[in-house]
Amino acid sequence: MRALPPYSYVPGHEHPHPVTDPLGHLYGRTHAAPIPPETLAQLPSEPASRCQGLPSLLATTPQWRYALDLFNEGFYWESHEAWEAFWHALGRTTSEARFVQGLIHLAAACVKIREGRPEGVRRHTQRARTLLGDLGAASRGGVGAHAATLGLAPESISNVIRELEHYRTECWHTSKTPVVRVLSADLRLAG
């Protein structure tokens, strides 16, 4: 696993903004495209064929695995940023990109837990559920099929969504410690 940042950014807490503050852990870094455009161009454009090549491509992409590690280790703002790069690389409006946008909303919901903002948690979780679709729909060709298309285990995503939907306010993690994991569920690669 690649080294994790020294803190998980939470807006309004004492840690500096990772990108805009000179003391931020990402300040001054330039980010290459998570998937080089020429690699994406080699994938077939026909959806069924594309779905067969994308999981293996992502599973071997260090940035994709790192984004999952960030989320699973409690670096929600950072995973949001990492997935946003994939969202752009996958075209923002493709079905795969919309699925990644759902993952972005899961990370945003976790940031809202750290901020102590229940309405934000509810809103982002609801949006994630809409974008991620029926995760049991893989066999029916539904949006949930993109969990497998992107190399993720659908049940792991379902577990995260369920946990967010049932998050109790007495469990708010507004601690200002460098990293606080708010979920017990992890996102996992399929297989």
Map each language-model feature to its residues.
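Residue-level recognition of tetratricopeptide repeat
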Residues: 68, 103-110
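Start-of-helix signal in alpha-solenoid helical-repeat scaffolds, especially tetratricopeptide repeats
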Residues: 53, 60, 95, 100-102
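N-terminal alpha-helical interaction modules that lie
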Residues: 1-78, 83-90, 137-191
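Generic structural signal for well-ordered, non-membrane alpha-helices
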Residues: 77, 81-84, 104-107, 126, ...
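Short, solvent-exposed positions on alpha-helices
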Residues: 77-78, 97, 119-123
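TPR/TPR-like (Sel1-like) alpha-helical repeat modules
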Residues: 117-137
